[in-house]
Amino acid sequence: MSQSPFGNVEKAKPEIDFPGDNPPSELVIEDLEVGKGAEASAGAQISAHYVGVAWSTGEEFDASWNRGEPLAFTVGVGQVIQGWDQGLLGMKVGGRRKIVIPPHLGYGDRGAGGAIKGGETLIFVVDLMDGR
């Protein structure tokens, strides 16, 4: 069994603290841990574990960790919300990044089902697990 040049990463589900204050109007990216693997770029196929929290309530609305399997997708081609496509660029495999996504880069005024209300700012902590 050969190891990917991008590496495989062992991590645990992160906790996200309640943000308080007013949400930002622009995308906010904060590297909590810088990875040492390959860098995510537009067109890269990646897998990422994440926890998503609503800014207004601090409540978790989704987490790949709860399903035991990371989300796999291609960066920058619209398979995920714009905040993810933009917020993951330049992230390296093995890294952990906090991304605060304003509504216009998330689910906008429509929200997402019953889990995310319209106009909600989203907080994600994303672990880039693999890429190619």
Role assignments for model-derived ranges:
Residues 1-132:
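Cross-family detector of peptidyl-prolyl cis-trans isomerase
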